[in-house]
């Protein structure tokens, strides 16, 4: 899994914001460890030099991997970690020009000949200095842990933290798959802002983007909502307030904390405490109560800059070694009957978006795909291709090994049910049916076709339907030529 989501976001920030971020050594370390191996190598190669000729940088890669070389450099350029400079390199002057040329011309040509432009690359000084310091300084402390502080409560175990983060993030996913569940105000706003849900009456319903979101790994899911939160924060606090950069740096710092250890809330600024309570709702931070003196990072926040997280449709801890559960749980038969070998309420809730559920046993849920269940999914913006991909992606190993995780007859029927809804296209239009003469009708019809305003016409009744944007031009055409 790549970290393209966060890299795309960082690359979209302006130079000033990135410079502010690179002032924090923990941010620099987090970004360095998030980069692909090749990009990391390039940074380490340049760590102890001021500049390096771009032409020689080609030697860092073989001809066979030149494309990966270019992509790695581009990523570093986009993140403003590496800069490209042009310097004038002196060369040997060429042979003396003809004596017939004026001395000023000869002098000008000599100056041009004695200089040659060379491209060099260099590391961002802030980024470079912070990485250097991090390599020589050991035992750096981000926040004090709870070694000398007791809050009179048994600290959560790692299993407790895993269970908590899984439960919290599943709640977020439940808000998408079950419109009867009411999310918190923050989560509701983020789901709307990110176009994962849409307002329908008094509640929220999932969109096509929301269904695609459910198919992604948890790392991408979390960053998707965090990025929306960052942007919303910048809008509320005002551009240039620095709140977005503060939260980004805070997130990167939290990713270096130790799993299972508690840290003092009192060491945080008021702004960071506000962020902390927001991160609780994502399952990234555990606090026993809002007034607890300690907070505990969960596996999700620690893995935030490495991407080493499993899909939360699987369990974070106990289920990750059970390959059958990781590979899939759905068996779909040619009679449209679907068997889901799962005890997860979340998985069943996801299936109910496009399956009519019939009954549920302790480790098995049975449903059937019907025209109405598919139409309900289509109304919510879920496409037939997304449904087919979802079944394939989560098919049971036995079904996947058969080479046909979803029967062709079922896949084709789902596409046909979608095509039923696409037989009619809706276009805002204007109808003309009172032409003074036949010549006026014919001329206007020709004009509408030439200008791409034409939709439909009926010659016997001299009726013409055109696009809405063509209304004023056609009225002007008739007035000018037939008034």
Swiss-Prot record:
Give a Gene Ontology cellular component term annotated to this protein.
transcription factor TFIIH core complex
- The record's region (Disordered) falls at 93-117
What coarse category fits the chief subcellular location reported for this protein? nucleus
> What does the UniProt entry say about where the protein is found?
Nucleus
Task: Note the SS bond partners.
Answer: none
- Keyword Hydrolase assigned to the entry: answer is no
One Pfam family this chain carries? Tfb2_C
**Amino acid composition bias (Low complexity), ranges on this chain:** 94-116
Q: Which UniProt keywords apply?
A: DNA damage, DNA repair, Nucleus, Transcription, Transcription regulation
The subunit structure is: Component of the 7-subunit TFIIH core complex composed of XPB/repB, XPD/repD, gtf2h1, gtf2h2, gtf2h3, gtf2h4 and gtf2h5, which is active in NER. The core complex associates with the 3-subunit CDK-activating kinase (CAK) module composed of cycH/cyclin H, cdk7 and mnat1 to form the 10-subunit holoenzyme (holo-TFIIH) active in transcription.
UniProt protein name: General transcription factor IIH subunit 4
Organism annotation: Dictyostelium discoideum (Social amoeba)
Organism classification, top ranks?
Eukaryota, Amoebozoa, Evosea, Eumycetozoa, Dictyostelia
